[in-house]
């Protein structure tokens, strides 16, 4: 029997075919840490080169700036299903077995003690035990070993390490990503997934783990090739879950995972899009398309600049004033097609399609001005959640998706350091930093959200570099005065596998935000900067509305992959789902 071995680190999404005598490659993942220097404040004047209207300038820019258009990409759908069969009976391209370190235990005769591995190894004539020993495969997270088995029902059998225990959503999502990587490497069209320790799982745990694996598989297959001249289409068509149960409950869990995953992909595509393609108008168009797609439950209201002026959104419009691309205020409303509405929620996202910093321009490589398309990340998460919710259609809950979309640019019409602006709730703000613009747009967005009569608001934004200093790149900061709302959102984040850490709302820090000429300044300095930013936002939320702020600046981008993460969608959708009846 000819057998070829493949080894990899799951997080790298790369598989290497090797002979038995080779050693597995050691590929480790790393996090990129942003080092934030003190802000350089540079102010200068720019003489306008033309006197035409912003609308005309927008048309010219959109027609000539790079002549770039995204390639049309259809995301292939994967068929997910469950079966209760013997693992040795399945026929297809890859049988992927998730194993913990405990599952890899062997007896005195070097045979597996785990029942599933023992049966599978006997079916393969002892090859599984031999290969795992030779390759020092122990079930550690990131380890993967794949055997080619021509002539048998499964063309390949893979062992994928889950670590000491498999109990977290992120562990099962990583398993799904490893399945996707193996499928891409071998051009497999059919995969079956089994957990070696599934017999110890409760029925609910089996359903949840299947959902997480499905999510990881969909996202692991995704590659954003819209701006590349060549791309490859994934070959994977079907994934069968063996030993996870069958019937409507499993089907519903798998469908939920699919809907959320495609919402995450939509978010990734928005954040990945360059600013010369994704303008505020295009972002608004994408939102309107969602309303059209889910017209039985969703409507769109896009406010233009004049309408925002009528609503006295001076804070938001001050940020937008310098750009040739006019602002577009996005408001999507989800209402169930039937039944009473018991709860009204709002999801508010920061929507800067590009942030130059304004007159306090971003200078130096540490401030990554070339990457400032990522400032659309909060709004992208909100719209990704809208897409998923349009598919899932949770009952009994009304959801408002709100984005104040604009660019923060530099021109003779732009806001200047020292300007005093007035938000739509009448609060005045001294602009002591034009690069602290996100909170200015969110201020009017939060006032608008409260005016919709909602019970709870969650806003999400790439708001401060200081949160990266505080928490690093693996989690987002969360701020709220409501313990109950904090519990709700933390529970949603834990179920989704997205890490949040509750930060203090230290009111004494408000002293840093006081102005001599206005009600407040918009930047209180770097010390406690993420906290003071949250305290600023709090001033624009009605006292009768529960509110929570997520600062996701460190989680929006994966520098190693040079791509957006899609962070926030899963947590927001889970939170909405938990508030439905």
Swiss-Prot record:
The active site is at residues 362, 439. Pfam families: Peptidase_M17, Peptidase_M17_N. This is Leucine aminopeptidase 3, chloroplastic. It comes from Arabidopsis thaliana (Mouse-ear cress). Its cofactor is Mn(2+). The keyword Protease applies. It comes from the Eukaryota. Mn(2+) 1 binds at residues 350, 355, 375, 437. It catalyses: Release of an N-terminal amino acid, Xaa-|-Yaa-, in which Xaa is preferably Leu, but may be other amino acids including Pro although not Arg or Lys, and Yaa may be Pro. Amino acid amides and methyl esters are also readily hydrolyzed, but rates on arylamides are exceedingly low; Release of N-terminal proline from a peptide.
């Amino acid at each position: 029997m000819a057998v070829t071995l493949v080894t990899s680190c799951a997080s790298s999404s790369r598989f290497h075919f090797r002979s038995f005598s080779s050693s597995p490659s050691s590929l480790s993942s790393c996090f990129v840490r942003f080092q934030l220097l003190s802000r350089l404040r540079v102010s200068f004047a720019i003489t306008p080169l033309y006197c035409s209207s912003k609308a005309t300038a927008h048309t010219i820019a959109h027609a000539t700036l790079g002549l770039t258009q995204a390639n049309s990409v259809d995301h292939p759908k994967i068929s997910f299903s469950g079966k209760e069969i013997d693992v040795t009976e399945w026929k297809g391209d890859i049988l992927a077995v998730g194993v913990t370190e405990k599952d890899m235990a062997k007896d005195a005769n070097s045979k597996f003690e785990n029942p599933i591995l023992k049966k599978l190894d006997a079916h393969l004539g002892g090859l599984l035990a031999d290969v795992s020993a030779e390759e020092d495969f122990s079930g550690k997270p990131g380890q993967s070993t794949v055997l080619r088995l021509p002539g048998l029902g499964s063309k390949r059998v893979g062992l994928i390490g889950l670590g000491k225990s498999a109990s977290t959503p992120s562990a099962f999502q990583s398993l799904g990503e490893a399945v996707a990587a193996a499928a891409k490497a071998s051009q497999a069209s059919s995969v079956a997934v089994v957990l070696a320790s599934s017999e110890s799982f409760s029925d609910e745990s089996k359903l949840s783990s299947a959902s997480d694996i499905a999510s990881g598989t969909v996202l692991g297959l995704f590659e954003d090739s819209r701006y590349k001249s060549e791309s490859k289409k994934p070959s994977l068509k079907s994934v069968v879950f063996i030993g996870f149960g069958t019937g409507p409950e499993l089907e519903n869990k798998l469908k939920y995972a699919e809907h959320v995953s495609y919402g995450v992909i939509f978010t990734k595509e928005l954040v990945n899009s360059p600013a010369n393609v994704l303008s505020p108008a295009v972002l608004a168009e994408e939102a309107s398309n969602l309303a059209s797609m889910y017209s039985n439950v969703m409507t769109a209201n896009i406010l233009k600049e004049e309408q925002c002026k009528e609503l006295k959104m001076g804070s938001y419009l001050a940020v937008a004033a310098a750009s040739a691309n006019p602002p577009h205020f996005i408001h999507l409303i989800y209402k169930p097609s039937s039944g009473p509405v018991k709860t009204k929620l709002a999801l508010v996202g920061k929507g800067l399609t590009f942030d130059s910093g304004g007159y306090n321009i971003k200078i130096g490589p540490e401030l990554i001005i070339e990457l400032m398309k990522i400032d659309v990340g909060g709004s992208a998460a909100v719209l990704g959640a809208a897409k998923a919710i349009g598919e899932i259609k949770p009952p009994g809950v009304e959801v408002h998706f709100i984005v104040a979309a604009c660019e923060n640019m530099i021109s003779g019409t732009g806001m200047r350091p020292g300007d005093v602006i007035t938000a739509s709730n009448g609060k005045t703000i001294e602009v002591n930093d034009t690069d602290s613009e996100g909170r200015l747009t969110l201020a009017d967005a939060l006032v608008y959200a409260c005016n919709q009569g909602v019970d709870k608001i969650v806003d999400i934004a790439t708001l401060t570099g200081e949160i990266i200093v505080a928490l690093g790149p693996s989690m987002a900061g969360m701020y709220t005065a409501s313990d109950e709302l904090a519990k709700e959102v933390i529970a949603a984040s834990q179920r989704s596998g997205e890490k949040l850490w509750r930060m203090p709302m230290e009111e004494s820090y408000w002293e840093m935000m006081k102005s001599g000429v206005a009600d407040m300044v918009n930047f209180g300095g770097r010390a406690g900067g993420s906290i003071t930013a949250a305290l600023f936002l709090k001033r624009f939320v009605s006292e009768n509305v529960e509110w929570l702020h997520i600062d996701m600046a460190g989680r929006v981008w994966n520098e190693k992959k040079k791509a957006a993460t899609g962070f926030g969608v899963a947590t927001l959708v889970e939170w909405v789902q938990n508030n439905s009846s």
